[in-house]
Amino acid sequence: MTPSRTPAALLPDLRRETRSSWDLLTPLALLALGVIGVAFIYSAQLSVTQGRGSGLGAWLRQEWFKQILFLGVGGCVYVAVSLIDYRFWLGVAHWFYALCLVPLFIVLIPGISGEAATRWGAQRWIPLGPFSFQPSETAKIAVLLVTAGLLVRSRIGTVRQSLGTLAKLALAAGVPMVLILLQPDLKSAIVLPPMVFSMLYVSKLSPRFFAGALGAFLLLLGAVAWDTSRYVDYMRAHGKSFSRDKGAYEESTWFRLPLHDYQRNRILSFVNPDEYDPNGIGWNQRQSLISVGSGGVSGKGWTEGTQAQLGYLPRSVAHNDFIFAVIAEEKGFLGSITVLGLFGVVLFNGIRIAGSARDRLGAVIAIGVTALFSVHVFVNIAMTIGLVPITGIPLPFISYGGTFVVSCCLLQGLVQSVWRFRKDFA
């Protein structure tokens, strides 16, 4: 059980820093990933940024320069969070959770943030001058902290013994998930269940729960397949175009799952990319596969890739969701393996730190963060090479995004704190 200490007592005492130790392997790997990200964001946006002029104002409009600023802010956040005993967050988790819910409600108010907050029909961002804030990213941190707090304060064992805790967890994770889905932002919502389930697993919840959860997941997949099949039947029966008549099935009276037509289209383009509008729905993934396949062993050279430079891989996604495809084309198999190796260092080190944690709280936090990063890495790269449908999940520390980068730094700072305070230096 977590020792009862006041939050103030868990804040850093810089006079004792020489007595603690830092895990240097993870931050070095994260720094390398950040540098790679900046380099290939620059490459992916090169043809766009060349005409933006010079000077600070022009630089602030360039994604690669803004990414450097995001990494700088994130680095400061990483160090600050690492210096604080991770047990401090147990006392403020509920306040942090409530604070993170506020922008999730705000972003749903029509017109509250202006047109800049609405992209591709989704309200996911709150504009802040030349930057924007994505509330769903901080919501992931809030769910992590509240889940960790509930698990260490509760008795976890059989499903019957854990029902009360599971109900609280479902509510704590369910509220932000619903708000995120309403934006709609499926990609940010689907990463929460694996994170929570991994934290439940390390808390030694009965295997029967996970067997039941697996069964429910398989039923959900079956329901999605059934819904998508009915969607195809409806569109063909009514002479609708999968690319032009978006929203037609959503507005129909047929019984259906609460999915958007563009999400169904992504599933169809994944299952049969040659049949379902390969030049529309399936364009991004087809161009991504061409990028990865054309890189060879060592690639075409930095800034020399044709898919992103000529716009075949759309510039709107090349620097974020599909940046791994840019890396694979320009640096080939060797560059791809390097990126995977760096992520492997971060993820395996996260598991190692969880195993050396001083208490269950530290283990739960480290495993939760590692699981969250694992989902991001696996789904993003699998999406890039055509193993899963397009979801838009970004690649940590490499994909462009301010809120995402800073939140990733905060989460890794928590893992570093678990390592630093694995022993009591008081």
Language-model features and meaning:
Residues I68-V77, E330-L347:
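Hydrophobic alpha-helical transmembrane segments
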Residues T2-L33, A39-P184, R244-G247, I381-P394, ...:
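Membrane-helix boundary/helix-loop-helix interface segments in multi-pass membrane proteins
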Residues G350-T391, I398:
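Loop-to-helix entry and N-terminal half of a specific, functionally important transmembrane alpha helix
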Residues H94-W95, C100-L101, L166-L179, L186-F255:
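Hydrophobic alpha-helical segments of polytopic membrane proteins
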Residues A117-W125, G212-F333, R360:
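Hydrophobic, glycine- and aromatic-enriched re-entrant/interface helices and adjoining loop segments
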Residues G164-L169, A213, V364-L372:
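Alpha-helical transmembrane segments of multi-pass membrane proteins, especially transporters
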Residues I190, M195-F209, T306-G335, I393-G401, ...:
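Interfacial segments of multi-pass membrane proteins
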Residues F105, K140, F197-S198, S374, ...:
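Hydrophobic residues within the alpha-helical transmembrane core of Major Facilitator Superfamily
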